[in-house]
Amino acid sequence: MSILPIVIAPDERLITRASEVTDINDKIKELVNDMFETMYDAEGLGLAAVQVGVLKRIFVVDVQLETIENEPAGYGSTGKFYMINPEITELSDEQVILKEGCLSIPEQSHEIKRPKYLTVKYKDLDNEEQTLKASGWLARCIQHELDHLNGILYIRHLSKLKYDMAITKAQKIKKQHEQ
């Protein structure tokens, strides 16, 4: 396993839609393991393949933050998952505002409104289709990482003014990291 370099915004790869995984082979399995290792090293909750420069529809999440009181039956708010070719099949009408951050937009966090619950289907490393009902931070992380796979940075959910300010700050931080 290895720690992969994380792509920092602004970068074209972060706003490019990732392609479907057509063959779940040893290279994909190694990528998933490397992504978990990279995410843990960076102290993140999730990481999309595009964030390590691989334009494939894969992400990993590990949410052990909380459990939700009065959680709907069958929904989970914690867990460690990798998802290949994920697709949200259901989103709740109920929404919640929480602060989000991103490994590709370091040193920033912003309040983002997202659906509270979701259902997602995805492939596992055995090419079997799985379905997960998620809530809380797990649902939020899945939505955030799926946005990455669709070429959408979480700051796109902000007003234009706040987005522009966030990108300007990201550019300054990226220049500092490159020096």
Curated annotation (Swiss-Prot):
Q: Which cofactor does it need?
A: Fe(2+)
> Do you know which InterPro entries this protein is assigned to?
Peptide_deformylase (IPR023635), Peptide_deformylase_sf (IPR036821)
Which reaction(s) does the protein catalyse, per the Swiss-Prot or TrEMBL entry?
Answer: N-terminal N-formyl-L-methionyl-[peptide] + H2O = N-terminal L-methionyl-[peptide] + formate
Keyword Ribosomal protein listed: no
Gene3D superfamilies on file: Peptide deformylase
Ligand binding (Fe cation):
102, 144, 148
UniProt keyword terms in alphabetical order: Hydrolase, Iron, Metal-binding, Protein biosynthesis
EC number of the protein: 3.5.1.88
The record's Gene Ontology biological-process terms are: translation
Recorded GO MF terms:
metal ion binding; peptide deformylase activity
Q: Where is the signal peptide?
A: none
All disulfide bonds of the chain are: none
Q: What are the positions of the active site?
A: 145
Free-text comment on the cofactor: Binds 1 Fe(2+) ion.
Family stated for the protein in its record: Belongs to the polypeptide deformylase family.
Q: PANTHER family per the record?
A: PEPTIDE DEFORMYLASE
What's the stated role of this polypeptide?
Removes the formyl group from the N-terminal Met of newly synthesized proteins. Requires at least a dipeptide for an efficient rate of reaction. N-terminal L-methionine is a prerequisite for activity but the enzyme has broad specificity at other positions.
Q: What's the name of the protein? A: Peptide deformylase
What does the record give as the organism's lineage? Bacteria, Pseudomonadati, Pseudomonadota, Alphaproteobacteria, Rickettsiales
